[in-house]
């Protein structure tokens, strides 16, 4: 997958800056309070603005580096997930459409993906990573129209140990097989009603997208999702993958 980041990079960075606004404010207030408390506030307004400007430039540079690293890693993640998907389907003699209502094939695919997804998450400075497939394991269920298969991993801490990963979405037995226990609010499949622009995303005619801040179902966690489309060589929309950025 070749993604052109130049056309949307500025708007994406702006959106990330909005999400981090309160952090900037906190840093500024903390600096100001510290200067007052320790009697280091200069006698001129110019001194204060200079110190504040240094802090702002430092934060902005860190955010730019964070975004560049995350964007590059997401490209690699998407390439990896597409390759695993197409290789697994080819080995089983299946088309993507034949994953529908095929629990054995979906099990095999998620089993192949979970370890690689975990490795990308462990290397990232993010709170979660996911791959969501545009198929469902059982279309006879009442809510099957809004359910999609895939794997969603989260970090319990910002460490890099596999023991700190939990399974938020995906087949529980696969997670346990790889030493990853289910989240306390685990569900097997994704609920796409939480993605109001899903039908638009299915067109796959975008490089990447950052969601609005959403609250994860049944939790108090507020997050944004970086979303990159998974599209086959024949134009088939496979699904989405990306990273979770926690507001906390």
Language model: regions and residue ranges:
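Extracytoplasmic/periplasmic sensory segments of membrane signal-transduction proteins
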Residues: 71-196
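Solvent-exposed loop/turn segments at secondary-structure junctions
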Residues: 136-138, 216-217, 245-248
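Short, Lys/Arg-rich, polar N-terminal cytosolic tail immediately upstream
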Residues: 1-9
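Structured loops at beta-to-helix junctions and adjacent beta-edge loops in soluble globular domains
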Residues: 132-134, 228, 246
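Juxtamembrane extracytoplasmic/periplasmic/luminal helical "stalk" adjacent to the first N-terminal
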Residues: 10-20, 25-108, 125
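Solvent-exposed, extracytoplasmic
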Residues: 112-117, 240-248
């Amino acid at each position: 997958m070749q993604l052109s980041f130049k056309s949307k990079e500025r708007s994406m960075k702006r959106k990330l800056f909005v999400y981090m606004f309160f952090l900037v404010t906190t840093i500024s207030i903390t600096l100001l309070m510290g200067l007052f408390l320790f009697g280091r506030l200069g006698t001129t307004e110019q001194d204060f603005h200079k110190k504040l400007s240094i802090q702002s430039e430092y934060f902005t540079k860190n955010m730019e580096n964070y975004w560049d690293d995350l964007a590059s890693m997401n490209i690699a993640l998407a390439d990896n997930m597409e390759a695993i998907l197409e290789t697994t389907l080819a080995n089983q003699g299946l088309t993507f459409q034949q994953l529908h209502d095929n629990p054995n094939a979906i099990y095999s695919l998620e089993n192949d993906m979970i370890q690689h997804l975990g490795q990308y998450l462990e290397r990232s400075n993010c709170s979660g990573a996911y791959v969501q497939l545009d198929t469902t394991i059982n279309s006879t269920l009442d809510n099957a129209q809004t359910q999609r298969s895939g794997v969603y991993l989260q970090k319990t801490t910002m460490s890099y140990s596999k023991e700190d990963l939990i399974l938020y979405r995906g087949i529980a037995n696969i997670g346990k097989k790889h030493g990853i226990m289910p989240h306390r609010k685990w569900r097997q499949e994704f609920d796409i009603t939480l993605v109001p622009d899903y039908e638009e995303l299915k067109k796959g005619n975008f490089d990447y997208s950052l969601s609005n801040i959403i609250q994860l179902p049944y939790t108090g966690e507020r997050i944004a999702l970086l979303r990159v489309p998974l599209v086959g060589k024949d134009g088939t929309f496979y699904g989405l993958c990306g990273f979770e950025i926690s507001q906390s």
